[in-house]
Amino acid sequence: KEKNKIKAQTETQTESRAEAQENEYVWKNGHPTEEEVLCQSSCMGFFRLFNNLRKQRGIKLEQLVNGVMTRRMLSTIIKGDGYFSRECWEFLMHRMGALTDYFEAIVSRKELEDWREREDICLLVCESPKEARTKLEAYEKAHPKMTSMAKLFCLKIEWLLKKETASPQVLYELACEAVYCTVKEEWQGQLSGLWLAPAELEAILLVSWSLGLLGETEKALFLFHQVWNYPKKKGWEDRMTQLLCPQAALVGMQL
């Protein structure tokens, strides 16, 4: 019941996040700016790479974009009336276990500034949590209608900042809410049937950690092993697996 409540609460915010993403990357008044034309050109090149890899691996497009992009937004991109953000394209490639380090991308100034703001928050979480909290709150205030990927980031940071003070139940609910930002399918059982990026698996690791704090050791270990074995089952590239190993090892030590 508690899990369904958390899922329902998260789903009520999904439409506004989807709308935020659509409004961000669709031409205003039907006329792209010069910057948008450059981003769109880069995006279509990435979309072809993404589509070719997806077809090689026999993955349905709807499966990969579920929870990240609406059908309407996907249709808009295919028609050439909008474009992938770098974050979105990278997220979807990561769901296939494919690195994106090999490709250069053109990103908008706004997206670059957004990335820098998040990087600043990450650098402060461990060494200066109070300052990280201040920057996180400022970021959330500046982005009232953020995308599902941005919300996933914020909730994971929130969990880390509350780890020492919040109750295990609060941490569990927070971690579940983070997962539900982008994962719409059932995920507390077998993960092998889902297409998940490292960012999503990190959130599931936080759920596992929270379950351990709640004394639900068996459930915690089950979920942990699902995440630990996921890259191998999905045939991830070695360097992709390295993006997840340190976090998984840390949670494993806590359990």
Positions of PLM-derived features:
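A short, Lys/Arg-rich alpha-helix, primarily the initiator
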Residues: 21-57
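Short, charged recognition helix plus adjacent turn
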Residues: 36, 105-131
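Alpha-helical residues within helix-turn-helix
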Residues: 52, 62-63, 91
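Short alpha-helical DNA-recognition segment
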Residues: 56-76
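DNA major-groove recognition helix of helix-turn-helix/homeodomain DNA-binding modules
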Residues: 85-103
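Flexible helix-coil transition and linker loops at the boundaries of alpha-helical arrays
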Residues: 105-106, 140-150, 181-197, 230-238
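Tandem amphipathic alpha-helical repeat scaffolds
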Residues: 115-126, 152-167, 199-215, 243-254
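Helix-turn-helix repeat elements of alpha-solenoid scaffolds
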Residues: 124-138, 165-186, 214-226, 255
